[in-house]
Amino acid sequence: MFQAFQQQRWRWLVFWAVIVAVAIAAPAVLPVFRLNLLGRFLSLAIVALGIDLIWGFTGLLSLGQGIFFALGGYGAAMYLQLNSSSGQPNGIPEFFSLYGVDRLPFFWEPFHNPLFTLIAIWLVPSLLAALLGNMVFRNRIKGVYFSILTQAALLVFFNFFNGQQKLINGTNGLKTDVTQLFGQMVGSPEMQRYFFWVTCVLVFLAWLFVRWVVKGRFGDVLIAIRDDEPRLRFTGFNPTLFKTIVFAIAGGLAGIGGALFTVQSGIVSPQYMAVPFSIEMVIWVAVGGRGTLVGAIFGAVVIMYAKSLVSEAWPQGWLFIQGGLFI
């Protein structure tokens, strides 16, 4: 048994050593455009880890992770917009003047603070996920009904954000590529390399965290919920609490992924809450392998890279491939 443990440990060490070597070599080998794409796809891998946690280990198929992904993106974009608005009239982002707004909305104010922004990026999605999850789980809603409710919530948030032109620029979204951070343009090659490194580190930390969650007693309870929730409830456990916690964790991971994706893509908009995108997130995990964690990471990166390459050669072709993958 000890020998098997040692072999598994060495396999993981070799695996991550190869990944680190690739991550180090990527900025020197890949053009800036391709490096930026890889950084975006790695940020999506963090979202995929959260989905694997709730679906692969707990049996909760959420079709609404785009809500939490977008919230993280909006948090990052709001800070960057404010950080670059010192020369604007009244010190507010330029888009407000298009709608006759001359005073910063109250909920924007805290995002002047970078520490608050970093906390809000994961805490706000986590709290919202906990609230929505608790309302659903305490009524013992599960299976396909849970999936339908998460998609319904996604549509509500999508339509709400689309209509808020005076608050968050509505369908146009918030741009980040022309904003500044640390005295440099966020969209510059230097900053994009920096974001790539940050994303690589956070993917690894997210994997470590989720692996720690599923390898302990907490993870055993999650698997028991997936396999036989009524029996677990009969033994005295409260599945509602565990499902709420794990759904909140997945929401927080989606928020972090959304923030990283936003600073590398240059914009956040309500389209992040579009139904097809949230369904696509599930495909990443399904292709990579439910309950594997590493498979979720590779699934997100490989599927999105394939989408990019196919779309460049045949713009409409990916829709057919995606449909086949979903089936």
For each predicted feature, which ranges?
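Transmembrane alpha-helices and adjacent helix-loop boundaries
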Residues: 1-327
